Amino acid sequence: MTTLQTNKDPHLRGVSPNPSKIPVLSQRCQDFSSVKSRSLDQENQDPRTPAQKPPRSTQRQRPLTDTAGLRSKTLHQTEKSPSLKTLRNPLEELKPSSGGSNVGLVTHPQTEAIGAIEFVADPAALATILSGEGVKSCPQGYRSSLAQRVLVRERKGGTTQRGQSARSSAYLAPRIPTHQVGPARASCFSRLEGPGLRDHTLSPPRLEALNPPPGSSHSSTRPSLQELRRETCGGGRDGDCTDRRTSASQASRLLLKTPVQPASLPLRGEQEAVPHSDDGGGRHHLGLAQRIPLKESLTNTRSTYSSMKRFAIRRKAQFTPLRSLPKVQQAQWLSGLSPHSSPEEPALPWRQIAMKLFDQESRITLQKEPRKPSVASTSGPRPKRTPSHQELRIQRINILQQLLQQEVEGLAMGDGAPLNGGSAFDMTELKLPTAEISRTLTASEHNSGAALVGLSQHSGATEPLLSEECEEPQAYPEETKAAQPCSTTELKPPVPHRAEPELPEPCLPALSGPPLPSCRGQAEPPMACPRTEPGASAACALEAGTPESSTQPCCNQGPPATASLTFSSQSPVCASPSIHSLYPTGYSGPSSLAPRTLALRQRLRACLDTIHSFQEAHLDDECAFYTSRAPPPGPTRVFTNPVVTTLEWQDALRFVPIGPVVPQDSPS
């Protein structure tokens, strides 16, 4: 029946906008409910099919609940109340008028419905809504603000009298998205566009609390107030539209005052309003609410998204710092060679670790090899080995170079009796070797460089060379005598020296043998070591016995170890006896300088021998390679072209040092 009446009403709707203007004010409460149902029906149904308007009353009664269930209830109610239907007709008129005019309560509805000019005010109302004033306006399409908005679009449709139908169609369009949104989620697409935030909208109770001044809403505030009224009327299932109008106006004011509150507003009103806006039954409500909240939601959404962005940014900032902190810590750990390795930056840390490990190994070797020399050479720095490997290397190299230069100068100044044929070395030879040694030291800083430094500092390193060169164990006993002044570190190295002969690379084991603390403890200057620790003589004597075997094997191993330059160069250095000889310089030389010069000569000789042996081994390898390689090219070629053969020989025997004999044969 209501449907039939609503069908009959269309002419009233179209014609009644004028009379509905005034009645809207007086009847809005009653019409409000009826209009709710109508607007709901219209929104739910095509505006052109007003027969379905009975749901209007249904939605009108329970706009906040599920539109489907509410519709059934409202259908029953619509059947029960034909008066509501009659009211609905004027309400419909008022509704179009209210939709058409911002002054839904005033007589403008006709003009608004007739002309879209008055709807221009609606844009302002919509703007206010967007600003957040009436954003909350519940999805009650019956409200004049909603109707106005709808009418504006309706105007766009180009229908004035049928604006309601157009409105309902417009509502339908928006309500489709609204339907997509859960009714419980978005009460009127509450100001907060976000689905989670939509629920936080003004609640009818709050609006009612704001109600006290009835009729407080008018043209300027109507859009928002009407929306609020919709919320209040929709939220409250009572038909008191006036109270809710006032509450809506107040709510709109509150919204204007606090546009951001919706998120914090109680969810009850939102939920109630949600059914109107979200319910399929309250689709027209939803459409209206959607439009308004959608527009308003833009601002709300902005704020919401901004907050979301803030959260995201904060999260990123928090997590990123956490990650970065571990990275830094890991980098620090890596710098400290801690077991922890940075997963994000493995390459650099591992490289550094590898470098450090090698450095540490070199240190250990150097400490153990030149433990004694290191004591003298890095007397200050040794205890500080913690400093940096590079610094220690540089210091050692510098000290070694200085010592070598001083010793060479001393040799030039005073011809010290050459130990073990030390005279064989001319000063020029010494100078050249010193330059070579300095170069080699610079080349291999931590390996041979540090060892040479220790040896030069302790001058004992020369003794192993001397013993190797002269193969005179007596020199070691002498060294032991002189070694008595040597530091206990010398004593410790002797043991490693003993071990050295056993190991193919005795230097490394010997180095490992001497404890670092002893070296550090013996960090005293080379001169101080002999002075401070005369008790080392026993160890030196032991070394004297072992040095022969140890130093000789070191030297022997050095040349054979030519495959690895560092080892060959280190082996002479490794020989701890050389260290002993350094401080026992007094025994060998007529003067303190003489023993040093002799030790230096011995060291230089050993170093040079090792270097030469290494080079020779390489040359031998190259010669063997080239020689073995030369024969195949001839047989492979069927025709022996003299030019080709010569070229092949040149290519194969291009090695100049080896070539002189073979190239002569090869051209032939």
UniProtKB/Swiss-Prot annotation:
Transmembrane segments: none annotated. The modification Phosphoserine is found at S16, S97, S169, S306, S324, S338. It comes from the Eukaryota. Residues 1-102, 154-177, 189-285, 364-392, 462-502 are annotated as: Disordered. It is found in: Cytoplasm. Residues 227-246, 269-282 have a biased composition (Basic and acidic residues). Could be involved with bystin and trophinin in a cell adhesion molecule complex that mediates an initial attachment of the blastocyst to uterine epithelial cells at the time of the embryo implantation. Directly binds bystin, and indirectly trophinin. This is Tastin. It comes from Mus musculus. The gene is Troap.
